[in-house]
Amino acid sequence: MIRRGLKSARCAPSPSRGGLGWGWVSGHGVPLFFVLFVSAAFVVACTPAPEPSPSSKALSFEPCRLPSLSVEIQCARLDVPKDRAHPERGTLSLHIARLPANTRHPEADPLILLAGGPGQAASALAPFAAALIETRRQRDILLIDPRGTGRSSPLRCDALDEKNEALSDTVLTGIAPKVRQCFDQLVEQSIHPLDYGTLAFVEDIEAVRQALKLPRVNLWGGSYGTRVALEYLRRYPQHVRTLTLDGVMAPSVRITLNAWRSRDARLNALLQSCEASESCRALQPSPSAALDTLLARLTAPGLRIAFNDPRTGNAETLQLDSDMLLAALQPLLYAPDTAALLPQVLTAALNDDFAPLLALTQSFSSTLGGQMNPALHYAITCAEDAPRVSDEERETLLSELPRIGALAAQSFAACERWPVATLPDDWGTPVVNDNVPVLLLSGALDPVTPPTYAAETAQTLTKHRLITAGGIGHIVSTQACAPQLLAAFVKSANLSTLPTTCVAHLENSAPPLLWSNPLMPAP
C-alpha cells in the first residue's frame, strides 16, 4: 500500500476503469446548459500580476467519496474571500478533490482539471480524472469546484431547480422569466451575483496553489474551462508548466452571441450532410424541409401532445411549440453519434411521434442534472458576456438566424436584470505567451467551440500545437488515444515529442456511419 499525505497518511486508490460520464460530452454526455444561452503579463517581459495574500493555513486533505466514483479519494476545503476588494464581506468555502498519484514521490506540479459550462462542477470530471491512468503514475490530479457550483458554496434558486420538474418543464422555452426570478431569489439571500465571476475563480485557483505550496501546475481546461485556464495563464504565467485547452473558447468569444451562430452553422451543416447521403435520405428524404414543416406546424400556440415520461413512465401532456422543438434538438449536435439520429427523430415527429425526441432530451438533461448549476451559468454569462453584445449585433443575429433566433432572443432577455461585471481592460483580448507550451484540441464537428476558435487563440501563443480531430464533436480528451496524448504532453512538457500515431489517428478520424444503422425502420 502506498501511503503519503499532508495531514495524515493517504492511500492511493486503484485507477478506475469504469465508463466516463460527465457534463459536456465528447461523443456521449452532452451539456444542455453549456453555452446555450451555452494586458498585464501578456509577455515574459511584462510584470506578472501581483500575488494575492497566501492562505493562512495549508490545505488539510481527508478521505472522501464522490458520487461519480466508486473509489475513495481525498478532499479538502479552503475559505476564500467573497470579494477580494472587500474582504470584510466574509468568505465562502471552496471544495478541492484530489486523486493521488500512484507513487510515493509524485511530481510537485499536479494536473488541475477545469470544468465547462459555465456552471459545471469539476467534481463531475472525477471519472475522467480516474481514467487518466498514465498521468496519475506521476502526478496528483486536482478538481476544484468553481465558487457557486458543486460543493463550493453552490448558488441555489428554486426558479431554476429542475430536479422536481416534469419533463415538459425542462426545455428552454420560458427560461427568461425563470432567470429573472432566480436573480430576485439570490438577492433575497443577500448573495451578490458579481462575486461569482471568472476572474474570482482564477484567484481561487491561485489561492489553492499557494495553500499547497506548489511552484507550478499543469492546467487542463475543457470548454468554458479554457477561458478560466487562459485567464490564469494571462495573470500567472510563471506558475503554469503546461496548458491543455480542449474545446477552446477564444477570449474574444461572447457566449451569448457566438454560441448561437456556431449552433446554427452546425445544424445547417448536418442537414446538408444528410441530404447528400443516400443512406440518410432513405431515413428522411428531405431533412431541411422536414424540419421547416415541423416548425411551421408547431408555430404558437403549438400542438398538445401526450407521452409517457421516460424517467417515470407517467402519462403527461405537453404543449409543444417550434421554439421547444429547436431547443430539444440542440443537445443532439454535440456529438456525431447523437447528431446522426436527427433524420429518425424528424421522421418520427412528422408522423406525430415525439417520443424519440423527448427521450433523447431527457437523457441529456438527466446526465447533467447534478453537474451543472444554472444559477452560476447565468451569473457569469449575464455579467460577463451579454453586456459585450451591442443592440445592433443582437438584431443582426436574430435576422440572420431565422430558425433559432427566437431562442437567442430568450437568452438575451434572461439577462436584462442582472448586474454588469467590471472587467479589466485586457478582458476579451488575446492571451500572449512565449514560454508556456500549449496543446490545443478541437473537434471538427464541435457545434459550440469550433476549430476556428482554437486557431484564433493559438496565434499569440508561441509554443503551441493545434490538433483538430476530424470525426469528433465537443471535447476530444476523452476519445480514443487522447488520454495517452495528454499524459505524454504533461509528462514531457514537450510539444515536439507527442506520439505521432495518436496525433494522426485523431486528425484522420471520421464520424460514425450511423445513417445506415437506424433505430427505427425507414419510411
Give the residues covered by each predicted segment:
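Gly/Pro-rich cap/lid or specificity-loop segments adjacent to the active site
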Residues: A49-M324, A379-P523
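Tryptophan (W) side chains
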Residues: W22-W24
